[in-house]
């Protein structure tokens, strides 16, 4: 860790272990992923046992909470879109004497579209499956566009396939920028 010119602590990883506590309300189950803005963990509400996802923002990527505020407001605006993971609340923790913003949202069971495709014969979908997947994606993106928003970074690692059968139930990750 090094400090940049604005004296914001530069954290590259939180490395939270399973069983760790977040704000006394949540217990860390495990790390789901990481990216430019921060890390995402699967967590469990202590009082209800409900599993959620928590995005912890790196402080140097979230100056004055601008990034997390924008992200939360965008998710709130898109809350009625079926393809969006539902945002619940913002929390604050202190990590190494630094305030860290956390956005808590629904935890969605499923797998990344990239992993789903790798498991398919020839790593591709049949034309019938592909049409259904593209239709589900187009309908979800249309809902977002009708609200004058966009994804900004749509690719197979930002799409979760949470149900597959006659149709696909898809959810989008990383709705920022």
What positions do the PLM features span?
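Activation segment signature within eukaryotic-like protein kinase domains
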Residues: 133-134
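Protein kinase glycine-rich loop
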Residues: 29-35, 40
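Juxta-kinase regulatory segment immediately upstream of eukaryotic protein kinase catalytic domains
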Residues: 1-21
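Catalytic-loop of the protein kinase fold
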Residues: 145-162
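Short beta-strand micro-motifs within the conserved protein kinase catalytic domain, predominantly
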Residues: 86-101
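Conserved short submotifs of the Hanks-type protein kinase catalytic core
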Residues: 97-112
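ATP-binding glycine-rich loop module of kinase domains
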Residues: 46-67
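AlphaC helix of the protein kinase catalytic domain
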Residues: 113-124
């Amino acid at each position: 860790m090094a400090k940049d010119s604005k004296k914001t602590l530069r954290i590259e990883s939180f490395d939270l272990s399973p069983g760790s506590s977040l704000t006394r309300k949540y217990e860390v189950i495990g790390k789901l992923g990481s990216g430019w803005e921060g890390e995402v963990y699967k967590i469990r509400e202590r009082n209800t046992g409900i599993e959620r996802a928590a995005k912890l923002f790196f402080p140097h990527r979230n100056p004055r909470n601008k990034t997390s505020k924008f992200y939360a407001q965008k998710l709130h605006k898109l809350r009625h879109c079926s393809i969006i993971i539902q945002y619940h609340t913002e929390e604050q923790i202190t990590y190494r004497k630094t305030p860290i913003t956390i956005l808590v949202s629904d935890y969605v069971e499923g797998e990344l579209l990239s992993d789903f495709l790798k498991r398919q014969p020839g790593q591709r979908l049949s034309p019938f499956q592909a049409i259904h997947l593209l239709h589900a994606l187009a309908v979800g993106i249309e809902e977002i566009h009708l609200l004058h928003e966009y994804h900004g970074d749509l690719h197979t690692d930002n799409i979760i396939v949470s149900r597959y059968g006659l149709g696909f139930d898809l959810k989008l990750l990383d709705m920022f920028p």
